[in-house]
Amino acid sequence: ESFELTAQTETKDGNKKWLSFRVMVSMDVISSQLKPVSYITITDVTEKVEKNRRYAREREYLRDCAARDSMTRLLNRGTMEDRIKEELESVAEGQNYAYIAIDLDNFKQVNDVYGHWVGDRVIMSVSNILREVYGNQVSIGRMGGDEFAVFLPDVKDRMWIQGQADEVLYRLRRQKEMIGMAEEPTASIGIAFGPEDGTSFRELYHRADAALYQVKKEEKNSIAIYTMI
């Protein structure tokens, strides 16, 4: 019978080492009697443990890269969709939630007039603003190009959600000088509230997008809620 234990120890000079302790128990004849005898083997496995940890970190990094937009480090479209589907499955009865679609106004014109490096600055500004306004505890994604989304799984106050969306637009307009544009960068926002506007990702996405389209058609640089259009 045997068992093995790996533990970290500290040497006299302060270095950390990982040691594997393997204990084997066998029955041997001692003084004409059959008695259990333990044999302990100690092996330095520091290199092996550190290599496994390094591989684990690399695998985690690769998984994270596959889940995120390479420029902004926000969730990419596929991951965002999967996250929202998971969160919708755990929604309690009577719980309200919101899907917020954000789309930059005249973004092609920004790229054409100022160049793609300024367009990239605008994209990064939006991603940073979304993190600042909504925090790191909710799902925020870049759905592609100049399209972003936020999913709020537990909405208590819809006016507060509108206020946050207004704050996003306000902060974006203030980025003009930092980005290097002659006019204020703006965006349009469409909001779908669940469960009445939808109970699936597809329903919420399309209804927030319909509200967004209404803003784009009428005035831009504003917010529309699906149930009110």
Regions found by a protein language model. Give the residues of each.
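Short loop/turn elements at sensory-signaling interfaces that couple input to output
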Residues: 21-38
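Conserved long alpha-helical elements within nucleotide-processing catalytic cores of c-di-GMP signaling
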Residues: 63, 67, 76-98, 105-135, ...
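PAS-family sensory domains
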Residues: 5-16, 24
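Cyclic nucleotide signaling catalytic output domains
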Residues: 140, 167, 181-182, 188-196, ...
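Sensory beta-strand/linker motifs that couple input domains to effectors
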Residues: 41, 100
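PAS-associated C-terminal cap
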Residues: 43-57
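Short beta-strand edge/capping elements of PAS-family sensory modules
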Residues: 34-38, 79, 96, 221
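PAS/PAC or PAS-like capping segment
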Residues: 44-46, 104-105, 155, 229
